[in-house]
Amino acid sequence: MEELGVNNSRLGIETIGLGKAANVHYNLLPAALYEHAIRNGEAVLTADGALLAETGQHTGRSPKDKFILRDANTDSQIWWDNNKPMSKEHFDILHQDMLAHVAGKTLFVQDLIGGADAANALPTRVVTELAWHSLFIRNLLIRPERAALADFEAKFTIIDLPSFKADPARHGCRTETVIACDFTNNIVLIAGTYYAGEMKKSVFTALNYMLPAKQVMPMHCSANVGPAGDSAVFFGLSGTGKTTLSADPARTLIGDDEHGWGEDGIFNFEGGCYAKTIRLSAEAEPEIYATTKRFGTVLENVVLDENRVPDFNDGSKTENTRCAYPLNFIPNASPTGRAGHPKTIIMLTADAFGVMPPIAKLTPEQAMYHFLSGYTAKVAGTERGVTEPEATFSTCFGAPFMPRHPAEYGNLLKELIARHEVDCWLVNTGWTGGAYGVGNRMPIKATRALLTAALSGELKKVEFRTDANFGFAVPVSVEGVDTSILDPRSTWANGTDYDAQAKKLVGMFIANFEKFEAHVDSNVLDAAPVLAVAAQ
């Protein structure tokens, strides 16, 4: 086996059973990874110098193919209602078969870190068979100083072999694709998918499992910090404006997707960003757009024209086109990835039913309720001829990545909010004046004005009313914002229609929360919306 690059010579990949590989490249820098990826036919150069790769049939994550090893250690720790178990026997066979699969192959290894807080960091070794995967994960995680690599000791390992096809009968999985997590021995096996995002989310899943035991809250959120050191956290599902609203020229970006909240404040899990590029433009998102023209950026499934210029409006391969780049490609990004305890938490929802106000103040109990609910609404696909909105509840704003029971995360968040006296706001970026198809999208100008007032602390000083359906506090008037949109019922042509829609949405919240009722305190149950009120 020929080994090249910089690494801890005492801990080569033979120590994790991969000694049959023909060549191993440790911690290659972007230029060398470009050379390998292009030479091997894995990727092509764009006109501006980014690296473009295609992921084949898997253009997104495969949540139905993700498993967690069920053993004595994890049996009582994992929320099995939401996570698929794999037996130790099946995991061990899969592991051994994947180790045998690397015989004679060239492998790429990156030694990286998940977590910008040294006390809670997860040193991670990622072994891939593709050079572009190696560059992708190098962009996304935190890169140690080169001098530190000689002493690097991984506490977590990912083996990513897209060319290995799993056998459901032999390996206890569902298809040829598998993501198998062993949290006892801290290893994840990824096979049968070329989608690079599986590696990123495997580290996130691991930290979501490990950190609550240390009383550190893992969060699927973006975060930024103001000039006075006032940090803010933005929870929200896809399409709610999490990335757009946290990108504020007046504030420093800490990170766009994954963070922890511990004893000393909040910290990014990552050292890069994985941004959607469909319909990306220089006008709407100039900072993200600029990264797509940088050497070192990885583009996924983006269509190129005849001059190799990306066409971000072309979703013919997938709507989930992406770019992966280091955080330092963003001009106002934090160099440390850390900030103090948040002053403000924003929970974003895109309510297509037109019921929610544009902003509401939450108590700690209401914040836990809405965090566990993880509500947004999606507009049904036109190909099905359906115009009714579809409610989506993804607990903790990231159910696929939460191995533990949601109440564990919710209770931890509630305690941190109360201890640090954090202001919590629910912000609706969805519809006003009626549901989707009748009303209009919430004006981004109004959302930004309300957000600015919330982050500055000014919004706390205005007069509030109690929402009749959800019980949270809604501002009566805010300077610079049209007062009419603050009361959603008044924006509807017919108040009775609004009441019926509100009753419908409240019923969905109540039905969704039934599974959590036995796991939360009575004061959190008291924070639920009230169906009887909505029915009046």
From Swiss-Prot:
Residues annotated for ATP binding in this entry: 201, 220, 236-244, 285, 322, 447
Record note on cofactor: Binds 1 Mn(2+) ion per subunit.
Superkingdom: Bacteria
Phylogenetic classification of the source organism: Bacteria, Pseudomonadati, Pseudomonadota, Alphaproteobacteria, Hyphomicrobiales
Family matches, as Pfam families: PEPCK_ATP
Involved pathway(s): Carbohydrate biosynthesis; gluconeogenesis
Key words of the record: ATP-binding, Cytoplasm, Decarboxylase, Gluconeogenesis, Lyase, Manganese, Metal-binding, Nucleotide-binding
Gene Ontology MF term list: ATP binding; metal ion binding; phosphoenolpyruvate carboxykinase (ATP) activity
Listed name of the protein: Phosphoenolpyruvate carboxykinase (ATP)
Catalyzed chemical reaction(s): oxaloacetate + ATP = phosphoenolpyruvate + ADP + CO2
Residues annotated to bind substrate: 61, 195, 201, 322
Ligand binding (Mn(2+)): 201, 220, 257
Subcellular location: Cytoplasm
InterPro entries: PEP_carboxykinase_ATP, PEP_carboxykinase_C, PEP_carboxykinase_N, PEPCK_ATP_CS
Leading EC class: lyase
Family the UniProt entry places it in: Belongs to the phosphoenolpyruvate carboxykinase (ATP) family.
GO cellular component entries: cytosol
Signal peptide span: none
